[in-house]
Amino acid sequence: MARRQTPPGLPSQRQLRAGEIVRHALAEIISREDFRDPDLSNVIVTVGEVRCSPDLKHANIFVTPLGDDSEEGRKRLADALTRAKGFLRTRLGREIELKFTPELHFIADSSYDEATAIDRLLNDPRVRRDVESEG
């Protein structure tokens, strides 16, 4: 039987599964550890998504601080986690059962702001009126 091919540009099932494993493990590690970095202490981190490369050797981790919606807060968190990535990668290697522990790349996640902006736009009375008149 032929293998099902993933369309170009989309992650494979293997990448998605590895990304979820890394996401769950990192969220647990970050919540459990005590960091000396003042940018990481007393901050609750949301790991929104992890995208793995096709060879699973690199992982882009999208993070946001809970309660700090500013772009500066997200950037500060991503920079702090980047400074701690050696420590986090070592801990991650002990937690997951992958052949290689991926290289971690932390990215400030702005998808929540984008979703809020779209939601606000859809709830605008003028847009709602247009949608209801078409339907």
From Swiss-Prot:
<comment type="subunit">
    <text>Monomer. Binds 30S ribosomal subunits, but not 50S ribosomal subunits or 70S ribosomes.</text>
</comment>
<dbReference type="InterPro" id="IPR020053">
    <property type="entry name" value="Ribosome-bd_factorA_CS"/>
</dbReference>
<comment type="function">
    <text>One of several proteins that assist in the late maturation steps of the functional core of the 30S ribosomal subunit. Associates with free 30S ribosomal subunits (but not with 30S subunits that are part of 70S ribosomes or polysomes). Required for efficient processing of 16S rRNA. May interact with the 5'-terminal helix region of 16S rRNA.</text>
</comment>
<dbReference type="Pfam" id="PF02033">
    <property type="entry name" value="RBFA"/>
</dbReference>
<dbReference type="InterPro" id="IPR015946">
    <property type="entry name" value="KH_dom-like_a/b"/>
</dbReference>
<keyword id="KW-0963">Cytoplasm</keyword>
<dbReference type="GO" id="GO:0043024">
    <property type="term" value="F:ribosomal small subunit binding"/>
</dbReference>
<dbReference type="InterPro" id="IPR000238">
    <property type="entry name" value="RbfA"/>
</dbReference>
<protein>
    <recommendedName>
        <fullName>Ribosome-binding factor A</fullName>
    </recommendedName>
</protein>
<keyword id="KW-0690">Ribosome biogenesis</keyword>
<dbReference type="GO" id="GO:0005829">
    <property type="term" value="C:cytosol"/>
</dbReference>
<dbReference type="InterPro" id="IPR023799">
    <property type="entry name" value="RbfA_dom_sf"/>
</dbReference>
<dbReference type="GO" id="GO:0030490">
    <property type="term" value="P:maturation of SSU-rRNA"/>
</dbReference>
<comment type="similarity">
    <text>Belongs to the RbfA family.</text>
</comment>
